[in-house]
Amino acid sequence: MLPVIVFGAALYPDGSPRPALLARVRAALGFGAQHSDSLYVLTGGVPQAGWTEADVMADLLLSAGVSEEAILREDGSADTCDSAIACTKLLRARGYGGPVAVVTSDFHMMRCVAMLRALGWITVSVPAPSRTDLSRRRRLWVHLREYPATVWDVLLVLTWRFRQ
């Protein structure tokens, strides 16, 4: 079994997926097509119109032919840090200690990988391309905010880890 952790992304208010979430699911499917033993670990518990990010991703994967047995939903987390910790708990409870594939937007990869490594995981990065239709200023902001967020989130997960 190879866990493929797919980090969620905000949904539209009607519960439909935004482009970032669709890109992440496409990247996960592409990776999973090359690894038949994939277990898709879907994160994101912020509901919109009764749907969580994990629910929407599961629906997309099921529609693409992935079996329900190959899907594990983590639908209780409110942010990236919560997701990393919750996935760690889920996988450790199942006795898993091997490497994990990490699927998220390219700009978000550094933070997700850093947190999971701080939690003791060996990671394989599966970046989803980010939108190209954003303004230059918005793209700069999206990338620059990841640096302080990475430092902060790694400190949070290390604090959690050492309190265990």
Give the label of every model feature segment.
Residues 1-140:
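A structural signal for short, hydrophobic/glycine-enriched beta-strand patches
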Residues 136-163:
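A transmembrane-helix-recognition feature enriched in membrane-embedded lipid enzymes
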